């Protein structure tokens, strides 16, 4: 039996406009009437001599130059040899952040699932069918009825709890106002803290350790589940996060901006975090994410996956040491722009209401990623197309 071979790779660069939302470049927030251009994203199709395509629609911006560097190496190769691709791409992209590996690896896993007629989670040995979810908000805004005040954040937390969510994560305003951040933590904590797990992610906005410490102590007062990426170092200074861990009792979650398994391991050895963050798009695909999960397991640590998507669901289904699926970014007034409905056909959804009363989301059961992409819709928003053969 001959091995499958990659014959062609097609990349579609597209941009779906944000409706009633805007961005500062740090975060996305609700702004009625606004229609700003979303980030330039990629649709990937890896064609083979088997007549089976590995597909993935990426939501991570800025990866095209890296994919352009690594895609030609895949032509003529066996798409099942994902470890070869992972190791080769790491070397090719050794001077970059390596975020181009993830989308391509996910497409290769999609091919493998279709080739073997199995969902990816089953190829990974996964068994979890129901994934507990938390609601992860858009950033704070200035529009009444949105998330314009601590009270509105707390109102939304109550709405999410009624929908079934087990946890709620705050993305506050992105201006670094410490007192306002603390006021959200206190309001949400006093309203739902005894009924939901609570988290906050300032998105690296605080200028000083002192600011991060003040907010961390507010998290302590409200018994928050974790405190994520507070400082403008971008979450990469192991020394200062070890100091922060020593100063507060709320667990620290770090790793979104490190990329791949090696710095995650270094961070654990430095005692700079309590939870790992991993993302199939950022961390070398499903291959790289599972390396992080297994490394964390060796340390007795948990891994929380970043943002929503089918690749995240398959990884989490194969991970013992993961607590929550991040349903983000959600808001009481607008759809989730981080996993837009326009890219899918069929029933798959990462919108606010796409959760069971048990507080869980399902793992796709179809071959590969188990989702059907709306390629016609993606082509509608296409900016450019690239072919490698």
PLM feature spans:
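Ligand-binding pocket scaffold of soluble enzyme catalytic domains
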Residues: 40, 49-53, 115-118, 123, ...
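Metal-dependent enolase-superfamily TIM-barrel catalytic cores that perform enediolate-based chemistry
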Residues: 130-248
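Shared catalytic-loop signature of beta/alpha-barrel
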Residues: 24, 81, 217, 223, ...
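Flexible C-terminal active-site loop/helix
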Residues: 4-7, 11-14, 18-21, 33-39, ...
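Glycine-rich, aromatic-flanked loop segments that form ligand/cofactor-binding clefts
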Residues: 105-145
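Metal- or metallocofactor-binding catalytic centers and their adjacent structured scaffolds
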Residues: 8, 47-116
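Conserved, mostly hydrophobic/aromatic
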Residues: 6, 51, 70, 104, ...
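Non-catalytic terminal accessory/regulatory regions of metabolic enzymes
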Residues: 1-53, 61, 102, 158
């Amino acid at each position: 039996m001959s091995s499958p071979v990659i014959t062609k790779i097609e990349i579609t660069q597209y941009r779906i406009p944000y409706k009633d939302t805007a961005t500062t470049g740090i975060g996305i927030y609700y702004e009625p009437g606004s229609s700003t251009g979303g980030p330039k994203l990629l649709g990937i199709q890896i064609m083979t001599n088997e007549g089976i395509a590995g597909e993935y629609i990426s939501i991570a911006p800025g990866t095209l130059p890296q994919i352009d560097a690594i895609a030609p190496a895949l032509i003529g190769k066996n798409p099942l040899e994902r470890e070869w691709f992972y190791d080769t791409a790491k070397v090719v992209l050794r001077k970059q952040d390596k975020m181009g590996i993830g989308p391509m690896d996910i497409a290769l896993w999609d091919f493998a699932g279709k080739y073997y007629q199995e969902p990816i989670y089953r190829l990974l040995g996964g068994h979890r069918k129901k994934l507990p979810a938390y609601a992860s908000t858009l950033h704070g805004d200035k529009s009444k009825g949105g998330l314009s005040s601590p009270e509105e954040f707390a109102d939304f937390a109550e709405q999410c709890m009624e929908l079934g969510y087990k946890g709620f994560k705050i993305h506050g305003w992105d201006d670094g106002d410490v007192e306002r951040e603390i006021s959200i933590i206190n309001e949400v904590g006093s309203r739902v803290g005894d009924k939901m797990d609570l988290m906050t992610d300032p998105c690296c906005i605080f200028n000083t350790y002192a600011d991060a410490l003040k907010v961390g102590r507010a998290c302590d007062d409200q018994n928050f589940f974790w405190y994520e990426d507070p400082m403008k170092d971008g979450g990469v200074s192991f020394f200062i996060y070890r100091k922060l861990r020593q100063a507060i009792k709320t667990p620290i979650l770090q790793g979104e901006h490190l990329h791949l398994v090696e710095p995650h391991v270094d961070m654990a050895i430095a005692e700079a975090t309590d939870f790992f963050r991993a993302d199939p798009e950022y961390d070398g695909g499903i291959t790289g994410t599972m390396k992080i999960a297994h490394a964390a397991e060796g340390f007795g640590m948990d891994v929380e996956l970043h943002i929503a998507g089918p690749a995240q669901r398959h990884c989490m289904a194969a991970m013992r040491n993961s607590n929550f699926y991040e349903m983000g970014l959600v808001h009481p007034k607008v759809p989730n722009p981080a996993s837009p409905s326009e890219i899918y056909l069929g029933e798959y959804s990462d919108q606010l209401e796409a959760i069971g009363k048990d507080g869980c989301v399902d793992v796709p059961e179809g071959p590969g990623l188990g989702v059907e992409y709306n390629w016609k819709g993606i082509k509608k928003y296409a900016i450019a197309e690239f072919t490698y053969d």
